[in-house]
Design a protein with these regions (language model features):
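Catalytic-core regions of core metabolic enzymes
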Residues: 1-156
Length: 157
């Protein structure tokens, strides 16, 4: 859906007690000042509701065979595997479509990380018993202190 319609959609989802949202739509801070304004409104509208994105492909949970992903993908169900986190939708798609024998438990395309940050995902996956390791591809870190703290904690787990 167009970025300008996302805010009202989030409001409607929250009204029906939606527990989390994936926002595929682009047209937010990645396009400049107007998009940044929309993204700030999106953050405010979400409040404490988790949101992956905007400007992302979403996530795939191979362990439970669940996907909020915009198109078909490859990958086998596995009991334990890698959690892959990337900001890039295209890279996540390329990885998922490659024919490999690598056991993947989760793939997350985090996009702009308006609400749910890469650090949140690292923390979440570090607690999952079906994750053997976490692999990340990042284009930038907005909170280096938090990133290092969460990463160090995961390394010790």
């Amino acid at each position: 859906m167009p970025a300008k319609e996302v805010i009202s959609t989030v409001r409607a989802l929250k009204a029906i007690k939606c527990k989390g949202i994936v926002c595929y739509s682009a047209g937010f801070k990645e396009i400049g000042k107007t998009g940044k304004y929309l993204e700030d409104r999106l953050i405010k509208e979400c409040g404490d509701t988790p949101l992956i994105g905007p400007n992302c492909y979403g996530f795939i949970n191979f362990s439970d065979n669940l996907a909020l992903w915009p198109f078909s993908h490859k990958g086998d169900r596995c009991k334990k595997g890698i959690a892959l986190i990337t900001q890039s939708g295209m890279l996540s798609s390329d990885i998922i479509m490659a024919t490999r024998s690598l056991p993947i438990s989760f793939m997350v395309s985090a996009g702009n990380q308006a609400v749910t940050k890469i650090e949140d995902l690292i923390f979440y996956f570090s607690k999952k018993t079906n994750v053997s390791c976490i692999a990340i591809h990042i284009e930038g870190i907005s909170d280096l202190t938090r990133f290092l703290a969460v990463s160090y904690t995961h390394l010790r787990a």
